[in-house]
């Protein structure tokens, strides 16, 4: 049974499914941006020379748009609180070879989920709890 995570009112998320790249290559990028601020993450992703950066950049940008449009959160105070990559289904196709043979080609896919959290509300809650 999969446990559903409790939804924090100051969190926004975006998920991408069946992205055609290896989960190992996507994890290399995700490990660099986990825990960083939104603006710093965008700068890092724009400057990294890997093909995996573009779909991750789009997901981070989409999660920030969800935060600002749906919840009214400020993009300057967003931090990547959770970023994970899971393996998806592997697409298989045959490449024709000489003498009637064929070789199997495997195209790995992955599922990426990004969660952004607003840290300004965290400070507000801590201050509120100290007063009580």
Swiss-Prot record:
GO BP: translation
Entries under InterPro entries matching the protein: Ribosomal_uL22, Ribosomal_uL22_bac/chlpt-type, Ribosomal_uL22_bac/org-type, Ribosomal_uL22_CS, Ribosomal_uL22_sf
CDD domains listed in its UniProt record: Ribosomal_L22
Subcellular location: Plastid, Chloroplast
GO molecular function: rRNA binding; structural constituent of ribosome
One cellular component (GO) term of this entry: large ribosomal subunit
UniProt keywords, alphabetically: Chloroplast, Plastid, Ribonucleoprotein, Ribosomal protein, RNA-binding, rRNA-binding
Protein's job: This protein binds specifically to 23S rRNA. The globular domain of the protein is located near the polypeptide exit tunnel on the outside of the subunit, while an extended beta-hairpin is found that lines the wall of the exit tunnel in the center of the 70S ribosome.
Assembly and interaction partners: Part of the 50S ribosomal subunit.
Descriptive protein name: Large ribosomal subunit protein uL22c
Lineage, opening ranks: Eukaryota, Viridiplantae, Streptophyta, Embryophyta, Tracheophyta
Gene label: rpl22
